[in-house]
UniProtKB/Swiss-Prot annotation:
SUPFAM superfamilies noted in UniProt: UROD/MetE-like
Name of the protein described by the UniProt record: Uroporphyrinogen decarboxylase
Class in the EC hierarchy, top level: lyase
InterPro entries associated with the record: UROD/MetE-like_sf, Uroporphyrinogen_deCO2ase_HemE, Uroporphyrinogen_deCOase
Lineage: Bacteria, Pseudomonadati, Pseudomonadota, Gammaproteobacteria, Pseudomonadales
One GO MF term attached to the UniProt entry: uroporphyrinogen decarboxylase activity
Gene coding for it: hemE
Substrates-to-products reaction catalysed: uroporphyrinogen III + 4 H(+) = coproporphyrinogen III + 4 CO2
PANTHER family assigned: METHYLTETRAHYDROFOLATE:HOMOCYSTEINE METHYLTRANSFERASE RELATED (PTHR21091), UROPORPHYRINOGEN DECARBOXYLASE (PTHR21091:SF169)
Amino acid sequence: MTALKNDRFLRALLKQPVDVTPVWMMRQAGRYLPEYRASRAKAGDFMSLCMNPQFACEVTLQPLDRYPLDAAILFSDILTIPDAMGQGLYFETGEGPRFKKVISTLADIEALPIPDPQKDLGYVMDAVSTIRRELNGRVPLIGFSGSPWTLATYMVEGGSSKDFRKTKAMAYDNPQALHLLLDKLAQSVTSYLNGQILAGAQAVQIFDTWGGNLSAAAYQEFSLAYMRKIVSGLIREHEGRKVPVILFTKNGGLWLESIAEAGADALGLDWTCEIGDARRRVGDKVALQGNMDPTVLYAKPEAIRKEVARILASYGKGSGHVFNLGHGITPEVDPEHAGVFINAVHELSAQYHQ
């Protein structure tokens, strides 16, 4: 494989020295970019973009052609695993993801297969290898998956939910059934991420989008325990380099200490945490990724730069910080403002790495 021309993202995740703080954005390949909207129109719909390796590669690279980002992230969806388990993923206009089959009984869960990454999710593996080849060493490629808890909520609710009442009711009424589902999902996520690593992903992130909606005790039992299981089963070295693992629980700021014990190299932070406090709490164990409020990108350029400067100062000197948003970039953001953000991180962070 081609040598990396820019490895500061991987170095920061491993707390090795860097020249400037690396930066990428969750959902950096997305609807805020006119070129993405053109590709999506050409593909026909969102799932056609995800399931065609050439289209997935095209949109993954678009933000890198526009901005000096330090990492690419595979263009895909967290719900590819439930779809490969036979749940029948589809998208309703204005409603988000839905499933034709909904999980409601132990029998439903027992019948679920564990997908084979090559056979059942081969289009994702093909996309990873295609993107890696096209990147040609420009920057590292991040693979990803949803967490078992987050995937389970979609499978039990049948789609998005505000209160996760069916999944939470299952947790309290029938924990045995939910644990079986989460265990199957943990096995599936482990093999899926390992498949991505073997196909060329140089770091992986687990998105625990809905873990922060659980009580502290339920988070430990139904979310963190399964992420810990996944982390322990991942390939951690490939092609002569460490493969860093990032865990991101949105609204998980109260539990950083226990997340830091899960075995990952880095924790993603949403914008409700103060990154300097997070560093004092867990910075000796893990790197940190984040954590600007994505809506700051609607503000004027000077305000964006000011907030970048504040977060950099809060983290302070030294490596171990990957700058990112606290969640995905939103569709109405002006692409010029995203550029201001990325350039500000590089320009204003150099002083912290001298």
